[in-house]
Every structure is written in structure tokens, then in C-alpha cells.
Amino acid sequence: MKSRRFRTAFNATAAFAAILFASQNAIAEKVRIGEAGVLSVDKLVELVALEYAKQRGFDYQLSVLKSDDICKEAFLSDQIDVVIGTNAYRLVQKLKVPAHHFIQLRMLAYVPVVAQASYKSWADLNGQDFYVHARGSGTEVLAHQMEAAHKIKFKNVSFIPGAPVRANALLRGTIKATYLNIPSMQFVMKSAPGKFLVLPAGSESASDAAVFAKTAFIAKHRVELQIFVDALLEVVRKTNADPKFIVAERERLKLMPNLPKDEADGLIDFFKVAADTGIYPNGGGDEEAVKSDFAFYTASGDLTGKPADLKVADYWDLSLVEAARKKLAATK
């Protein structure tokens, strides 16, 4: 009798352990995604795409990390599998990390905003503090390019992750000069008319945000990642075709519920500007786009060597986005 009770207890324990193990495996199989930087309205596209992909079987866990540096550290220590919102050029070339970008998400679209009472031109910023998003970010690259173009030298180039955070710092007066993305610039100008000035800046064609993962992970999880890339490209194209689409999807999917009313009211205007200026490329990246990145990031020092000598295949796996383009073309 005791033996039977023992077997029953053992079987129950084993069954529970099997269920627990299966549950842990299911959790472990989630694609762990790291979003570099605070969630701002320009990241609404990937949030909608993640919801679309989830409905199609893409199981993921999203972590919003404070900065590019923290996100890359989590990536290097295998705490996350996929990074959204920055690039891996320095990681691949200098640290020899086996990683590939697989879709271009956003192009550089930042404007230099200064406190008008302190500065009227780039020359006024010589010897002054300037604030950018993060080390190796597009904003840091642009700041150093403006130093060279205007023959000035900033006292310090300091890091404050997140354009909305820098926008609020401008409004509080704790900083006086920075790069902001378009929605944050619009927010600052509306909040304090006449107090801030946008300085002239040259146009650049390079990735501000891409999506990347380690090559072994891409090879093992191509099916899941293809679902995500398909969704990203679909949402980008629908948003560019009609900015009202992304606003309606935000409301339907209940995304960014705590977005301030003034920012929510400005969504359509932002995405119209984004569509007109090509901030979200309809193609998701190709060899020509990567070569533009090489030119920009070698000029900045993030990549070394001559742009013409760098190989696309060393930094990018374009097969996923190429497949997504074919699928979208076939459904027209």
C-alpha cells in the first residue's frame, strides 16, 4: 500500500515537474527583444509591428532599456537576442561580435535645437556643452560633424538617452543645446514659442535605427524573425501611405496609453513629415543603403577603413527583408 502511495506521489511529482519544465522551455523560447532607449512616438511603428507579429505566432518578450549602451551590454551578455533602435557596426568590426543587421528601420532625422537666449549660431557653441543621445549614436556623429563643418570645438559632448528626456531638459533649462528628433522638436517649439532656435544642419542619409541579432540566432530562428520582418515592413508601408493608419492602430491596440495629449495630437503631423522625408524607408534596407551607412559611419569613426573596402555581407543579412518585399509585392 505504501509502495502504491509512493508511486502515485512520485508520478504526480514527475508530472508536475514535466509541466514546469515545459513551461520554462516555453518561456525560454520567447525571442528576447531589447528596445534601445525610452519609448517615444517615433517607435510606435515597431510596437504596432510587434503586435501584428504576435498575432501571427511570433512569441517575444520586450525589454525597454534606458540607452543604446545598456542595450548593447545586455546583448553582449546574452540577456537579449534581438536589438531594435541602434546599430551593431562597432560591435562587429571592433569587438568581433558575430552579428548581422537584418532590417533598416529609421533614417537619421535629427535637428539641432538651442536656447535662443544663449546661442544664435554654431559659432556661438564653440567651447560650450552639447548633449546627444548616446556614445556611437547618430546624434553624436552629427555633433562631431558640425564641429568639423563650422570649425568649432564643444567643451563637452555629453550623453542623455532619449529625445523626449533631452526635450524636457531644454524646457527646464538644465541643458541649452542638443539634437532632437522631429516630434520632440515640435513639442519644444509648441511648449515655449520663441524661446528656442533650430540651427541649420546638413542632410545625411544613414541608418539611425536598425534591427540586429547574432548570426547563429538568425540562422536558428529564421521562421520567427521572418514573421517579425514581414510585419515591420507592412506597418512601415501602411504608415507611409496613410499616417492616419498608425494613429488608429495605436488606439485599437491600446499602445502608449500614457502618451501626453499634446504628443498624441501631433502624431499625424509627425508621421506625415516622416513619410515626406523618408524617415521610415519602404524598402527596409538594401545594398545601396548599407553603403550609405558605411560612408557615414567611417566618417564618424564608428567604422574604420575605406567605405569601398567594407563588405555588406560582413554586417548585414538582407535575405529576410528581401523575402518580405517579395511577399508584399505578391499581395498587391
Predicted regions and their residues:
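Amphipathic, soluble alpha/beta structural segments
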Residues: T86-L95, Q104-V111, D262-G266, D317-K332
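Pocket-lining segment of extracytoplasmic ligand-binding domains
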Residues: N87-A88, V165-N258
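Predominant activation on well-ordered alpha-helical scaffold segments within soluble catalytic domains
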Residues: A28, L47, H144, Q186-M189, ...
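Secondary-structure end/capping motifs
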Residues: H221-G305
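Bacterial N-terminal signal peptides that target proteins for export
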Residues: K2-T13
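Conserved C-terminal helix/tail region of periplasmic/extracytoplasmic solute-binding proteins
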Residues: K291-K332
